[in-house]
Every structure is written in C-alpha cells, then in structure tokens.
Design a protein with these regions (language model features):
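RNA/tRNA-interacting regions in translation and RNA-turnover enzymes
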Residues: 1-259
Length: 259
C-alpha cells in the first residue's frame, strides 16, 4: 500500500545494509507478506516502537536472499509510492536447454530461435564506446585449451551504487540476487547473451590476470561464501604478483569472495 505524502514513520531494522539515505520497501502494520507467512505488526525493539518492517527480497517474495534489505537507487521512487507501481508481477518461463544449444542459454539466442518461427527480433544496440588504451595490468593464458578466447576491459571513474529497478527486477526474475550496479550489469549481459562475465576489483589483480588450471588441493571461497576445494581440471582465473598467483574465480562458474 501507499503512504500519505509527507507522512513520517519510524521503523527499526537490524539489516547489514541498513543506512542513511537508501530507498527500501516498507510494509506497514496489517500488511500480509508472501515470504513471511504472517501479518506485519507494530513492535518495540530496544525501547523504540517500530511502525512496520523494512523488507528483504525473501520477505517480499521476489528472491531467496533474506540477509539484507531490498535496496533501491537514490531518487528511484518518491517516498510513499506503492511498490506495485514500480514492481509489477512477472511472468517467468522456466526452460530446459539441451547441451548442444549453449546459444539458447541467453535471451538473445532464444529470441533468434523465435524469430525463425516468424516473431519480430530487435537486436539490442551496444552503446559502449571503448578506447584502445594501454591496460594497467597484464593477461596470461596458461590453459588455452580451456580458454581459447579471453577478453579484458578496464573501467574507471565508476560510482558503485544499487542498480536501476528494471535491472533488479530482471535479475530477481532469473533467480539471481542484485549486488550493485557493477556486478549486476555483468550478470545481466551474461543472461542476455549467454556470455560468462565477471567484474574484478583492480586491487586484487596485482600485476595481472592469469588463466590456468587449479593446483591439487587449492581452495577458493566463492561469492556465495562457500569454501571450495578445487580439482586440477578446474579452470581458474587468478591474480598474479611475481611468482605467486591466487585464484580470483572459477572460470565461467562463479567469482571469488575477494575478486
């Protein structure tokens, strides 16, 4: 539901990403939430009356993540806007793709298949303007049979912030969790074009990127927080400095927690 313009309410949240200035989804007392199984009420938390509840994706019923608030970009919506206006119901197609059609793992590949049946196809235009500048790091590929083509780009001057609502909605619909605009755009393009992508923090790269097979017993903590023991057949993307290289991600599968 919506709130009257100018109406102020006090809500207590212990979420890890709760901070001043962010936009959140607010459920007022009496609201029934699909991911909570009960009505929201007023509660007293540490002596402060909380008039409602700021919501995580799980509580709102749009995703599995329940450890933090659903976070909107600054000025995405005027405070008090009913969420249904910005987050309409989705229709999601769940498709099983056979291994011989990796092109159909992306939206564009599916659209091309439908185009062959007579449906209209509008190819998305690439608005990116890239300059051929020297990179501040190197690239080495030790396992060309596993990565015959590896492309690196370099972006600077970025402001890390929540993604636009339309992109967050698309990622949630595809079963992914929005993180921030930098991570989300790589996942969005991956879903669109079936091309695995990852954004690396330059601080973790060192002298450059090394694509190699994992060493026996090598371990990697992935983005989902799981510590994994790697197999020598696993292809890893590592940051290297001198003779040492540390895995930053499992190629084509998942990035590392520190990457």
């Amino acid at each position: 539901g919506g709130m009257d313009a100018g109406q102020a309410v006090e809500v207590v949240s212990g979420a890890e990403n709760a901070r001043k200035g962010i936009g959140v989804a607010l459920a007022l007392p009496g609201t029934e939430l699909p991911g909570l199984g009960q009505k929201v009420g007023e509660r007293v938390i540490q002596g402060v009356r909380s008039f409602g509840m700021a919501l995580s994706p799980r509580e709102l019923g749009v995703g599995e993540y329940g450890g933090g608030l659903l976070e909107f970009p600054e000025d995405a919506l005027p405070p008090g806007t009913p969420l249904a206006e910005a987050w309409p119901e989705e229709v999601v197609l769940d498709l099983e793709v056979t291994p011989n059609r990796p092109d159909a793992l992306g939206l564009l590949g599916l659209a091309r298949d439908l185009h062959a049946l007579g449906y209209a196809l509008v190819e998305p235009e690439a608005a990116l303007k890239a300059e051929a500048l020297p990179l501040p790091f190197s690239l080495k590929v030790e396992a060309p049979e596993g990565a015959p083509h590896f492309t690196l780009g370099y972006a600077f001057g970025l402001r890390v912030a929540p993604s636009p609502l339309w992109m967050q909605r698309a990622l949630f619909a595809a079963g992914m969790r929005p993180i921030n605009n930098v991570v989300d755009v790589t996942n969005y393009v991956m879903l669109e074009r079936a091309q695995p992508m990852h954004a690396f923090d330059l601080r973790f790269i060192g002298e450059g990127i090394l694509v190699r097979r994992a060493r026996p017993g090598e371990r990697l903590r992935t983005l989902d927080g799981v510590e994994r023991t790697l197999h020598p057949e696993d292809l890893v993307i590592a940051g290297w400095r001198g003779e040492e290289s540390i895995p930053l991600g499992l190629a084509g599968v998942m990035g590392g927690a520190e990457s």
